[in-house]
């Protein structure tokens, strides 16, 4: 039996690839991400999450004990500590795209360009990790992205102008700046991400069933 890919991925919803990744052409800094339809985490990340039930504590007059009134339940945010390396030209271009991707998906459309999208919030992405019964098509938003450009590592220069000789699916051709199109990326970087689930209210109301969830039947629909 063939084993499916269990690596962690953050991807656009299938209908919104170009809205989030930009055009599939070398003039786009996110072009390397088209080869993986989003961000593929190359190394096993550390993932932390959980589930919470909120209760409102209530007390009674002249009583020795209190009472907790149930309020709501929710999945805790998903935090990811992930490593990336740049040991080749392709890896360096991919890492550059990853950094810019997370900068982009934490921003909204603003101003007059384009006017018809003004006010559109950051996108909902799809998170997959560890197969069918862990994180399977979980809809998430990116609430925080952090990384450190450390002083004690090497930085790799890459040419971003007409860089198509290494891999047709990775190479980019960006406008040359004052450095002639060269930029530097760290040979090793650790990133920190905070995700939160973002379900569609009407779909949640019509689809969620605790009995089915308990049996694991809703895990393939993104519920955790």
What are these regions (language model features)?
Residues 1-224:
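Compositionally biased, intrinsically disordered low-complexity segments enriched in polar/Pro/Gly
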